[in-house]
């Protein structure tokens, strides 16, 4: 993350937030979802409920008025309060895993969404360092179309430097987390409509040497961050105003590029604070993150993909970080060379050699 840049503008941003006048708008004026669109929202609610019943009242009203089809939520602390709140919401259900709980949940509109199954991945202890909260996957139908959504909350903090020799380095942990999830998406969910979202705790627009999302960004024909324009736009549109940065992301696979490019597609960090008296009222009672929403018109997934060897990128060789030819080794930092001339430095945790 751009630590120094963030420090420079944090004080100014905080002052502007503090001086913002109380708005005449209320939570009743909030809106995002429509009946004609698939409306997906990710939101870190910051250890819900941070201010008890006051928080649950606000959050219930916010969720209802935003009218999302699916909410991927992070940092649920009190599961009893969460369940009680959702039970009071008409037409909404929740997904919450039993056993050890990492704060990840879904809330979905049962009138528009048919929940097919939900499960966690990478639950074994060997994955706890890069993925301290096991990714929560939900398979669902919307208007007869099947989609997968993966909710996660990456490890925070760091020093804006990826230490390739230290698996405990915060940036390295986030990079390995992305590698694991990308491998699951490409090996298990290939050809499916998949959405990865959550508080991923880093910037997507950094230079390659410090960008922990390289595994996705290096394959633009397969993956796209729906919130790219937010991340590269002005601070007023970012998801984490307290320490001005954009950390909450929505990534889609190529099966949803057409929808994302649609003329009615919308992606935004929703400014709830303006509808409840200003930022400090919001932060004290709800969260320090803004929800990030994606609204798209879903088209039938009837396209038949025909892959030919012409133009298809395939792996042609591997070297270690010193440039020496070497065989594939699981968990080792390697340089992958492809038939189109591109190269990628990555860690593969697959048991077999990637293609």
Q: Would you name each region that the model predicts?
A:
Residues 299-326, 349-355:
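Residue-level detector of functionally pivotal "anchor" positions at catalytic/ligand-binding pockets or at interdomain
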Residues 76-155:
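Structured beta-strand-rich core segments of catalytic domains in phosphoester-bond hydrolases
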């Amino acid at each position: 993350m751009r630590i120094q840049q963030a420090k420079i503008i944090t004080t100014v941003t905080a002052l502007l937030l503090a001086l913002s006048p109380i708005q005449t708008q209320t939570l009743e004026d909030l809106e995002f979802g429509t009946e004609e669109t698939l409306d997906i929202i990710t939101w870190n609610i910051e250890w819900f409920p941070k201010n008890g019943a006051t928080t649950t009242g606000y959050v219930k009203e916010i969720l209802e008025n935003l009218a999302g089809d699916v909410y991927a939520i992070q940092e649920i602390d009190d599961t009893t309060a969460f369940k009680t709140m959702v039970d009071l919401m008409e037409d909404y259900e929740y997904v919450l895993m039993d056993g050890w709980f990492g704060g990840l949940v879904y809330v979905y509109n049962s009138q528009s969404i048919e929940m097919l199954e939900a499960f966690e991945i990478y639950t074994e202890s060997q994955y706890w360092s890069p993925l301290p909260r096991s990714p929560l996957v939900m398979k669902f139908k919307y208007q007869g179309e099947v989609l997968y959504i993966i909710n996660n909350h990456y490890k925070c903090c760091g020093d804006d430097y990826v230490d390739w020799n230290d698996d405990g380095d915060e940036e390295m942990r986030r990079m390995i987390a992305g590698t694991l999830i990308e491998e699951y998406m490409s090996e298990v969910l290939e050809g499916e409509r998949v959405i990865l979202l959550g508080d991923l705790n880093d910037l997507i627009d950094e230079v390659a040497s410090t960008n922990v999302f390289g595994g996705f960004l290096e394959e633009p024909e397969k993956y796209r961050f729906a919130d790219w324009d937010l991340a590269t736009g002005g601070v007023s549109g970012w998801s984490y105003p307290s320490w001005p940065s954009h950390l909450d992301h929505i990534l889609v696979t190529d099966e949803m590029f057409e929808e994302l490019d649609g003329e009615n597609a919308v992606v935004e960090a929703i400014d709830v604070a303006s509808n409840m008296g200003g930022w400090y009222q919001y932060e004290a009672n709800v969260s320090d993150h803004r929800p990030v929403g994606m609204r798209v018109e879903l088209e039938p997934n009837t396209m038949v993909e025909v892959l030919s060897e012409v133009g298809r990128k395939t792996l042609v060789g591997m070297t270690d970080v010193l440039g020496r030819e070497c065989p594939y080794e699981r968990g080792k930092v390697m340089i992958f060379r492809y038939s189109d001339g591109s190269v990628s430095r990555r860690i593969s945790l697959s048991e077999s050699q990637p293609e």
